[in-house]
Regions:
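ABC ATPase NBD coupling module
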Residues: 2-26, 57, 172-173
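Short coil-to-helix segment of the ABC ATPase nucleotide-binding domain corresponding to the Q-loop/switch region
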Residues: 38-46
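Conserved signature/switch motifs of ABC ATPase nucleotide-binding domains
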Residues: 78-81, 99, 131
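Catalytic Walker B motif of ABC-type/P-loop ATPase nucleotide-binding domains
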Residues: 104-107
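H-loop/switch region of ABC-family ATPase nucleotide-binding domains
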Residues: 139-140
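ABC ATPase "signature
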Residues: 163-164
Length: 190
C-alpha cells in the first residue's frame, strides 16, 4: 500500500507503521459501532481522550464541532438508544472526522438504515466530499457514487471487474458484467 507517499508492506509491517497509518485514517462501519452506555458527545470524544491522549476539554470542543458539522448540535447528551439509525450513523461520522483524518473508509454506511434515513447520511458524506475529504466508500448507493465519486471500482466475488472515472464507469462501461449490472440498477440511479 502506498499512502501519503509512504510505502507499507503488510507482510512485514511494524507496530509503529500501523500506528502511523491509524493516525491518518478513520472508519465508519455499517452498524455504527457506538458505545451504548455513552452519549453522542462521549462517543465522539472517547478515542480522542483514550487513544490520542488529548485533554478532555479540547476533546469536548472538537467533539461538539464534529457533531455540529453532521447536524447533531442538539443531541450531544443523547444516548444511542435515543437516536434514530441515521443520527447514530452521523455520530459515527462525527467520531471519524473528529480525528482529522486524511482519509475516511466507509463500509456500506447506509445499508443498516431505513430508506428515509439514508438521505441524511448521504448528505453529510456529500458535504465532506465537497470540502475535499478523501473517502473510500463501499456502497450500493449507485446514484450517490455517480454524483460524488471521482473514481469507481466495481467488484464481484473479491475481484475488480472494472474501474475508472465516475463518468467513464456509468456512461461508457467496458466490461459486459458492468453493463449488465448497470442495466439492472438503472432505476435506482434516477
Amino acid at each position: 500500500l502506498i499512502f501519503d507517499n509512504e510505502k507499507f508492506e503488510f507482510d512485514k509491517i511494524t507496530k509503529k507503521e500501523i500506528a502511523r497509518l491509524r493516525r491518518k485514517t478513520a472508519f465508519v462501519f455499517q452498524n455504527y459501532n457506538l458505545f451504548l452506555n455513552k452519549t453522542a458527545l462521549q462517543n465522539v470524544t472517547e478515542g480522542l481522550i483514550v487513544a490520542r491522549k488529548m485533554h478532555k476539554a479540547e476533546a469536548i470542543e472538537i467533539g461538539k464541532k464534529a457533531l455540529d458539522k453532521v447536524g447533531l448540535s442538539d443531541r450531544y447528551d443523547y444516548y444511542p438508544s435515543q437516536l434514530s439509525g441515521g443520527q447514530q450513523q452521523r455520530v459515527a461520522i462525527a467520531r471519524a472526522i473528529a480525528t482529522n483524518p486524511e482519509i475516511i473508509f466507509f463500509d456500506e454506511p447506509t445499508s443498516a438504515l431505513d430508506p428515509e434515513l439514508t438521505g441524511e447520511v448521504l448528505s453529510v458524506m456529500r458535504d465532506l466530499a465537497n470540502e475535499g475529504m478523501t473517502m473510500l466508500v463501499v456502497t450500493h448507493e449507485m446514484g450517490f457514487a455517480r454524483t460524488v465519486s471521482n473514481k469507481v471500482i466495481f467488484m464481484e466475488d473479491g475481484v475488480i471487474v472494472e474501474q475508472g472515472s465516475s463518468k467513464e464507469f456509468f456512461e461508457n462501461p467496458k466490461e459486459e458484467r458492468t453493463k449488465a449490472f448497470l442495466r439492472t440498477i438503472q432505476g435506482d440511479m434516477d
